[in-house]
């Protein structure tokens, strides 16, 4: 029974690992909206909130109530395209006065690959089609295109933080002002105002085209859009994300992120804020590392635009890694509870109650060993030692079940002649239950340890999937604990240790042919799965099984283990006769 249950859990693990990629690949996806065909969408008012102005009214330049329409602005345009660089210890940003946009956003402390170059967060392939960071979104596509292609007049106070840079444009009808303020953190203060014939028009700063570390289909699949109001974080499912769909406020922050990096916008006025969700498609090489591979994959690129529906926009913008320390340093007014900051953008999943403490514990261990691989090894040893009583309980439960197995078989033979619908079958179950109670047998006692151990494995899988600290972290021969083992030593170790565990663990009551099949099928199946898993997870898995082998060997030498072995040999001899 235990082996069948283990198979069920293993198959469940397969489903969890493969569900999201299969969903994206095989289920029909809504067509990506074409920029040239986008239609203005009206934000919907939330309950207990006054109706918001329609997109058409906002775009048409309706003056803000109580304000006079200003005179037409004088011309202010640059003659040629030029670039300006702003940097601090964390990033180096290159602006172009063409649209007042960001051409590159380089994070100095992160690499594009192990021992590679500093990572550029601008996804150039997607940005070339759907827009660069810090361009402006308006509900009028024609106006939007003009805003993001005009040549702005640039002014800056310097190239090193603290610094400010501004972009201005006017042509007698349209007047645009954008300014950015930088300090020594990942936060940028953004101000934007657009007027058409003196009437304010809503224009939202954008992060429209994913991130520069996205090079594979799985990396794009990890993208998500989320926002937080009060203590509640809402994560939008892919099917709810459209090109230009509006989520009206109030909310304290809204962000787009991938596995390791995020762009989060904090509106100055949460009540009048609105979030525009962006989703487009591009084609990328199926195997980016293989220059001869001509196969292309279609992937979804996510983005956001956040601003005020009532005149000029003032926001703070966090662009950087999804480290808990960096996100915690950004205080957000209006959020209640224990975390009034941006840590909600990190999604530990439905096992977050286990995954997050595991990660904090892993970080604490890292402070003392200074290597993430050895921190995983130490944590795995402690977890398995803590679960040792469960292994002992499982063996005791199996032994008790085998002791009463002949009596259970006799009861089943007694009622064998009755059909399943016969009331007598109920009496059989009552007799078996009475026998269990008399002998102190818990029929699910052998399953309980598995039920407790599996969430730890799933939580570890989820935790390592969002822990940027393990990105490009090395251990012995492994160059990146967040990526698969390049020479497959860890997956092979999983196969070998699983096979040994199968051989050493008592398999009472199982048919020899079935036992032989399981001894080979389970290691082969789990080994196949592990070939594409992160090395950090494979290390945890293989190390856990290695410790399990030592524990199982010790249990097999105990009186309990000897009794179990003798009972199995006795039953095997009876079957041979």
Q: What kind of feature is each model-predicted range?
A:
Residues 23-125, 167, 171, 571-577:
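Juxtamembrane extramembrane loops of integral membrane proteins
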């Amino acid at each position: 029974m235990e082996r069948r249950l283990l198979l069920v859990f293993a198959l469940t693990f397969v489903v969890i690992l493969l569900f999201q990629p299969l969903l994206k690949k095989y289920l029909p996806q809504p067509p990506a909206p074409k920029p040239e065909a986008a239609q203005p969408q009206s934000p919907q008012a939330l309950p207990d909130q006054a109706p918001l102005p329609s997109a058409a009214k906002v775009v048409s330049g309706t003056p803000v109530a109580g304000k006079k329409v200003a005179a037409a602005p004088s011309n202010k345009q640059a003659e040629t395209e030029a670039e300006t660089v702003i940097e601090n210890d964390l990033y180096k940003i290159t602006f172009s006065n063409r649209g007042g946009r960001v051409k590159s956003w380089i994070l100095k402390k992160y690499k594009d690959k192990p021992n590679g170059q500093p990572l550029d967060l601008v996804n150039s392939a997607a940005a070339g089609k759907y827009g660069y960071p810090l361009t402006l979104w308006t509900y009028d596509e024609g106006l939007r295109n003009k805003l993001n292609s005009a040549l702005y007049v640039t002014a800056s106070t310097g190239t090193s933080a603290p610094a400010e840079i501004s972009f201005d444009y006017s042509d007698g009808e349209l007047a645009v002002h954008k300014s950015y303020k930088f300090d020594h953190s990942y936060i940028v203060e953004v101000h934007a105002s657009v007027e058409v014939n003196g009437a304010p028009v809503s224009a939202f700063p954008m992060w429209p085209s994913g991130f520069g570390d996205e090079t594979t289909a799985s990396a794009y699949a990890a993208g998500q859009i989320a926002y937080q109001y009060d203590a509640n974080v809402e994560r939008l499912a892919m099917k709810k994300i459209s090109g230009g769909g509006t989520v009206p406020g109030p909310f304290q922050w809204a962000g787009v992120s991938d596995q390791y990096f995020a762009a989060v916008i904090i509106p100055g006025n949460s009540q009048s804020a609105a979030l525009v969700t962006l989703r487009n498609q591009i084609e990328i090489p199926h195997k980016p590392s293989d220059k001869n591979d001509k196969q292309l994959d279609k992937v979804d690129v996510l983005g956001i635009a956040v601003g005020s529906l009532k005149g000029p926009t003032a926001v703070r913008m966090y662009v950087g890694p999804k480290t808990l320390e960096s996100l915690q340093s950004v205080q957000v007014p209006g959020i209640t509870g224990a975390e009034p900051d941006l840590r909600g953008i990190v999604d530990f999943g439905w096992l977050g109650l286990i995954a997050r403490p595991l990660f904090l514990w892993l970080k604490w261990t890292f402070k003392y060993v200074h290597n993430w691989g050895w921190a995983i090894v130490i944590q795995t040893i402690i977890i398995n030692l803590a679960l040792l009583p469960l292994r002992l309980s499982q063996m005791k439960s199996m032994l008790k079940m085998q002791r009463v197995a002949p009596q259970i078989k006799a009861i089943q033979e007694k009622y064998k002649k009755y059909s399943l619908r016969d009331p007598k079958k109920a009496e059989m179950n009552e007799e078996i239950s009475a026998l269990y109670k008399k002998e102190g047998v818990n029929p699910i006692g052998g399953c309980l340890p598995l039920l407790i151990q599996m969430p730890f494995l799933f939580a570890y899988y989820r935790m390592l999937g969002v822990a940027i600290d393990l990105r490009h972290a090395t251990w012995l021969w492994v160059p990146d604990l967040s990526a698969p083992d390049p020479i497959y030593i860890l997956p092979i170790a999983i196969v070998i240790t699983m096979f040994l565990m199968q051989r050493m663990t008592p398999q009472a009551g199982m048919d020899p042919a079935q036992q032989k099949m399981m001894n080979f099928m389970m290691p082969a199946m789990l080994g196949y799965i592990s070939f594409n898993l992160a090395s950090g997870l494979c290390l945890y898995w293989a190390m856990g099984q290695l410790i399990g082998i030592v524990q199982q060997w010790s249990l097999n030498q105990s009186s309990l283990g000897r009794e179990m072995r003798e009972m199995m040999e006795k039953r095997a001899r009876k079957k041979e006769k």
